[in-house]
Design a protein with these regions (language model features):
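Start-transfer (signal-anchor) and selected internal transmembrane alpha helices
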Residues: 1-20, 109-123, 269-289
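Transmembrane signal-anchor helices characteristic of membrane glycosylation enzymes that use polyprenol
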Residues: 3-30, 129-131, 189, 232-233
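Transmembrane-helix motifs of polytopic, lipid-linked glycan transferases
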Residues: 11, 77-110, 154-158
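Aromatic- and kink-enriched transmembrane "portal" helix at the membrane-lumen/periplasm boundary
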Residues: 22-23, 68-76, 104-118, 122-149, ...
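Extracytoplasmic catalytic/substrate-binding loops of multi-pass membrane glycan-assembly enzymes
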Residues: 25-37, 47-59, 70-73
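Membrane-interface transmembrane helices that cradle and orient dolichyl/undecaprenyl
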Residues: 110-116, 155-175, 203-213, 273-278
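Short hydrophobic alpha-helices at membrane interfaces in multi-pass membrane enzymes
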Residues: 120-123, 165-183, 213-227
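Transmembrane-embedded, aromatic-rich helix segments that form part
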Residues: 151, 191-204
């Protein structure tokens, strides 16, 4: 019954957050980027750099359920729902941490007192964040921070699921999901990339769960996370599109081919390299190659 009550408590906490945010959403637009995000989402136009295409696509989906006079309310409601789901995954993450502190009995079950303490910890932590000023402020307006928070919470929760199942077959599917979500998050807000160091630390902690790390080992783990973050932030994000543009210029100006043919070739070549690498690593059984 622990799992059942855990799910019920998570649902109740997220429902409280959803009702609170939907009741208090902005009726129109707040006086900053929200008006731009609402308009660009409704018309699927280009927002200010670096852009938020994933957010705009989902926000546009919500605006399709009403007329143009209620587009702002629809986008604000989308933020409210994203924030409520953030609270849901935050609760589950806190429960995961509480279970690490309160160990079950020898038969693998929790006593009533420990279960109440675990559920209470998750509920108090999640509801405290629900009604915090900064999060509530962003939860009721058409901004990217609500969806960004959801992806961050979802990624960290997925890492806890991998942590619990790391020794089981196909546990690395959670790593694949995390990689996919981190890729999507680039189209929402770059703030999500700051979750990478925490994920790297969790991965290394699992490799030596009952051991200890020296100070130098902590430094090396931190440096690994910084390198991964830097490669994505300063390498992949700016230079992949730039290189695609150079290839397109070469195809159009030098080879006389139609516009966007170079970009299409670049994307096809990039996908081919990715699939080739995937098949080779599968053949050689190198999981994290």
């Amino acid at each position: 019954k622990f799992t059942l009550w855990n799910r019920i408590t998570a649902a109740v906490v997220s429902l409280i957050a959803a009702v609170t945010y939907l009741v208090t959403i902005e009726p129109t637009a707040s006086f900053w980027d929200c008006g731009e995000f609402i308009a660009s989402s409704y018309k699927l136009e280009v927002g200010h750099p670096p852009g938020n295409p994933v957010f705009q696509l989902f926000a546009r989906l919500f605006t399709m359920f009403g007329d143009n006079m209620h587009a702002a309310v629809a986008v604000n409601a989308f933020s409210a729902i994203c924030s409520a789901l953030t609270i849901f995954f935050l609760y589950l993450t806190i429960v995961f941490l509480a279970k690490r502190l309160l160990r079950p009995s020898e038969d693998g079950t929790y006593s009533v007192g420990k279960a109440i303490a675990i559920f209470g910890s998750g509920a108090v932590g999640a509801l405290a964040y629900t009604f915090s000023d900064t999060f509530w402020f962003s939860a009721v307006e058409g901004e990217v921070y609500a969806m960004s928070s959801l992806i961050t919470a979802l990624v960290f929760w997925a890492m806890t699921k991998w942590y619990e199942q790391a020794d089981q077959p196909y546990a690395n599917r959670w790593i694949v999901l995390i990689s996919f979500l981190m890729g999507l998050s680039i189209g929402i807000h770059l703030l999500n990339l700051l979750a990478i160091p925490a994920l790297v630390f969790m991965y290394y902690y699992k490799q030596r769960e009952n051991g200890h790390y020296s100070l130098w080992e902590y430094v090396k783990i931190f440096l690994v996370s910084v390198v991964i973050l830097a490669v994505i932030l300063f390498g992949i994000i700016p230079y992949l599109p730039k290189f695609a543009a150079y290839v397109d210029l070469f195809f159009v100006n030098r080879l006389g081919l139609p516009f966007n043919s170079g970009a299409a070739f670049f994307m096809a070549a990039l996908l081919a390299v990715c699939f080739l690498g995937m098949f080779r690593t599968m053949k050689q059984q190198k999981v994290f190659a």
